[in-house]
Curated annotation (Swiss-Prot):
This is Large ribosomal subunit protein eL34. InterPro entries: Ribosomal_eL34, Ribosomal_eL34_CS, Ribosomal_L34e_arc-type. Belongs to the eukaryotic ribosomal protein eL34 family. Gene3D superfamilies: 6.20.370.70. Keywords: Ribonucleoprotein, Ribosomal protein. GO terms for cellular component: ribonucleoprotein complex; ribosome. One of its GO terms (molecular function) is structural constituent of ribosome. GO terms for biological process: translation.
Length: 84
């Protein structure tokens, strides 16, 4: 039985063949997904999702709520705010 830390499915399991011919299980972190809008569930435009070592202020567009909401949701919210 694996260690208690490896029993959960938060780490993905990869079968690796060793030089001695045995097959062992390695545990790796799962790949991160593309950033998505919480309202429309569309991928966020303008986000550099491949560069995770930089902060969100460098990766995200500089518009209001950039990197949080999609452009469609932002346009709708701005229209509602202006109209009253």
């Amino acid at each position: 039985m694996p260690r208690p830390a490896y029993r959960s499915r938060s780490l993905r399991r990869v079968k690796v063949r060793t030089p001695g011919g045995r097959t062992v299980v390695h545990y790796e972190k799962r790949a991160k997904g593309v950033p998505k809008c919480p309202v429309t569930n569309l991928p966020l435009g303008g986000m550099n999702h491949k560069v995770y070592r930089f902060g969100i202020s460098i990766r995200a567009p500089s518009r209001p709520y950039g990197g949080v909401f999609s452009h469609k949701v932002l346009a709708r919210a701005l229209r509602l705010a202006v109209r009253g």
